[in-house]
Amino acid sequence: MATLKFNLRVDDLDDDTFVVRDFHGSDVLSQTSLSNGRVCNGYRYEISLASRRTDIAAEHVVDKGVQLEIEINGEVSQRVHGIVRSFTKGDIGHNHTFYALTLVPSLERLSLRQNSRIFQHKNIPEIFSILLQEMGINEFAFSLQREFAPREFCVQYRESDIDFLHRLAAEEGLVYSFIHEDGKHTLLFTDSSERLPQLGMPIPYNALSGGVSDAPYISHLATHTQTEVSQTVLKDYSFKKPSYGFEQQAHGVEMDYQRTEFYQHFDAPGRYKNDQSGKAFNQIRLDYLRRNAHTATGKSNHPQLQAGYKFDLQEHIDSKLNRTWLVVEAAHYGKQTQALEEEGGSGETTYRNEFKLIPAHINWQAQPQPKPQVDGPMIATVVGPEGEEIFCDEHGRVKVHFPWDRYSSANENSSCWVRVSQGWAGSQYGMIAIPRIGHEVIVSFLNGDPDQPIITGRTYHATNTSAYELPENKTKTVFRSETHQGSGYNELSFEDQAGSEQVYLHAQKDFDAEIKNDHSTHIKHDKHLKIDNDSFTQIARNSHLTVTGESRSLIKGDKTHVVEASHHQKVGSLYALESGQEIHIKSGTKTVIEAGAEITLKVGGSFVKVDASGVTVVGSSINLNSGGSAGSGRGYGGLQAALPKGLEMLDAPEELVPINIEQQRNTLIEAALKGSPICQVCEDADS
């Protein structure tokens, strides 16, 4: 009959320091707890010990490496390596002192650190490697079939490292198990049952009562089949493809024993943004929901039956069960009654285990872990590259720094691109105001998911204060911007204080307005307009101006007035025209000056007066056809008006030849002496 022996070694202590009295251990495939609800991060062994030493203290044992060995016929059949999580010193007897310890994997160290941090552009194996190495765990490996895409933004939020690892592993369909070797244990991550290790020798089934065998065997095996979900459907949404449904489906197999048409599992959001991830997540969800559809439980004395190992069963009466199985949970019991030698009992050393199996071709999936929910909005600061004031992408998204992020340098690498809520957002219309670097913003999270931040508001603080002092200007509503890479601002503000109501508009440089139809303005009091430089106005058709009172105009330079058709002026009373030097009137064909009572031309003491009594010519001398020449004027020299927006100005018209006034004067004098009409209009009036 096979002989059993249990040994335990602790780092830095002699190998024979402890003897094992008994142990109870459990191991699970990528689970966080046992069937009884106890916490178990891979495996957990409670071991009762004895030692002839009475001076062993916690500092000699706790957090040290430890190894439990199971010997069969003098050879190590199984070893469990880990660290000591807890240590108990019990009673001191005549020859022995009693101790107890808890053996767990080094992975459990991750349960002792809670953190909040952001991982960017890293895939799951990279994130896990960081978590493990930060805890000094270097014995880990990945055996994966699927390619894992980098996650743009992955947040560990107020959760322990182990909870974070469990959550991500379950989301991505990763399970972990352990490979135990002398003096170490390796954490193995896999995404398929095909990648898990298999025992080298088949295990026989022996349920005969009283059966004796030196080789370990399985003594009990019961299979279980139950109805489970037959189909999963997941949906999600991405603002980059707003009209695409992102719906993915997965269908179960080996379901002949159950109905399939009604057992659909639908969930949204599925937490994916592309079809490739959606398909994988759907299958992972279905595998989890159907993981208990086909299971088996059993008992054995084979110490190598550990969670995460496959084995071939043989010699079962039901040939269908002689297949490859995967251990997903096991409980181990060992008792060594003769460990205390003279104080021990007479019983034999015994070992047994109980286990749960699934067919090895089925992928076992860990239970999805709850994702931390952000209780409400957070405060963050907009960040970007050094020297920039505004930093955004083509969607108007910005980067932010959260106060709780201890790993961020508060720059363009502090977060993913975060969408910004705008007051109105349509297709090529709406409002846009990009938060600038240094602004404090309010960040909410879609569905409470810390991986999906969105800016929903902005706030002032002690450094970034409002445009006007408060509460003195509490009646103002202000929209003020700030000049980018300069000083100044644009502003539209409203004053609502009774009696002082005002709409104020300030443009730091240009102010452009385009109105595609009518523009009506009604000012019920005064209007003041001051232009420090030029003014340009272009009217494509007509211009009408009505002034009920006076109209005054002061022009300190030249004035050009061009009318390309007729020009009509009508004055109800006095029309007075005064020129400091010269008045020049020219007509291309004729000039008519008509008065109802009198016309007078006067120079010094000489004058010509035309009235109802006749024509009066008075001068120191009157010359008729006696030589001389007509006087000349400077003529028209006006400039063409420039068009708005600085268009090229037209060339000024050529200067006109002055009129020969002397000849016209002689003609007038001659006509006056003869009593003849001086123009066609006069002839018409005389007739």
Model regions and ranges:
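Assembly/oligomerization scaffold segments
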Residues: 1-117, 171, 293
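Acidic, low-complexity/disordered segments
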Residues: 307-309, 319-380, 456-462, 467-477, ...
